[in-house]
């Protein structure tokens, strides 16, 4: 019988509001409110996932300068299953394909351009593509591991935060692929706009494996409908590192490959900014990661689709 080995990694996926205020605070020499410095990030991760075990088996090795290619994003098929989770402030929709977070609705924030409707940030529809994806990359050429395109089973559980409860979780589990199974668990707390995301990589083979875990934010390059013609807020990816601090990148510059970001770091985050809101993947402080941004063709009929910001981190199990 094979010895089953596991690597468990917790990360934070969060949303922020009033991004312009945040940037104004930094510009004036104050601490960022929504996009903290690395020291603040560590506290955010601790607060959002209190009593959560620290990452296990994550090596200190430098991320390869030429990491394996992240699987290409593809348009969502019509036969995918949606799973909804609701807290007091968020309505979340997940796709069983990859356990992807595909829609986020803010229940306490009305959309100024759509009276009677709430703000929707992440979305996977005919009008918008904006999703948060994760998956594994094998270190062995030609060997496929579970990715954001892998069908996953959702475990039974509570789907709406109950009165008196402080948190709820939803778990997606892939089938074993080349001796490796990926189990994702999203945990969100009452009143919170961030969540702890646990990646449990189960190695059932007799071989040691050194996969890479990728985190990406994918969005089309279109502005929000109804945005004022007199002013325009930034929409696009952003990155924070110690070396180059906060950098935002225009979609047009990504398409032209005319941008300069820090490509390797042991701190920081990637984000996708949309109007006054943003989402971000925040990895544990001190964990090496490779950072990239690119334009990808997902086979969608939508104009200017799509772009992705990606973090890739090494693992060992």
Language model features with spans:
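Soluble non-transmembrane domains of integral membrane proteins
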Residues: 77, 82-317
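Juxtamembrane extramembrane loops of integral membrane proteins
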Residues: 10, 23-121, 172
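Hydrophobic membrane-insertion alpha-helices, especially the h-region
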Residues: 9-20
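Membrane interfacial helix-start segments of signal peptides and signal-anchor transmembrane helices
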Residues: 1-11
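Residue-level micro-sites within transmembrane alpha helices that shape
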Residues: 5, 21-22
């Amino acid at each position: 019988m094979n010895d089953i080995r596991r690597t468990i990694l917790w990360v934070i996926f969060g949303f922020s509001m009033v991004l312009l205020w945040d940037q104004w605070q930094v510009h004036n020499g104050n601490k960022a409110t929504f996009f903290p410095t690395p020291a603040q990030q560590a506290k955010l991760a601790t607060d959002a996932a209190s009593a959560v075990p620290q990452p296990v088996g994550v090596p200190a090795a430098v991320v390869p300068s030429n990491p394996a290619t992240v699987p290409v994003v593809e348009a969502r098929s019509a036969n995918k299953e949606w799973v909804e989770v609701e807290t007091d402030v968020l309505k979340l929709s997940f796709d069983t394909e990859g356990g992807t977070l595909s829609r986020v609705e803010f229940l306490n924030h009305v959309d100024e351009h759509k009276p009677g409707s709430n703000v929707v940030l992440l979305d996977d529809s005919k009008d918008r593509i904006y999703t948060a994806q994760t998956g594994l990359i094998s270190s062995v050429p030609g060997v496929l591991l579970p990715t954001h395109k892998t069908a996953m089973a959702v475990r039974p559980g509570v789907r709406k935060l109950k009165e008196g409860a402080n948190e709820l979780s939803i778990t997606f589990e892939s089938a074993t692929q080349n001796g490796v199974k990926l189990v994702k668990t999203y945990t969100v707390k009452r009143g919170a706009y961030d969540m702890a995301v646990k990646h449990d990589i189960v190695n059932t083979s007799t071989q040691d494996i050194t996969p890479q875990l990728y985190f990406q934010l994918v969005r089309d390059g279109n502005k929000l409908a109804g945005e004022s013609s007199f002013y325009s807020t930034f929409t696009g990816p952003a990155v924070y590192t110690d070396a180059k601090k906060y950098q935002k990148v225009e979609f047009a510059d990504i398409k032209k490959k005319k941008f300069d970001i820090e490509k390797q770091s042991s701190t920081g985050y990637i984000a996708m900014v949309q109007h006054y809101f943003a989402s971000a993947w925040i990895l544990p402080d001190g964990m090496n990661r490779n950072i990239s941004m690119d334009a990808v063709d997902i086979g969608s009929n939508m104009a200017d689709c799509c772009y992705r910001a990606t973090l890739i981190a090494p693992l060992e199990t």
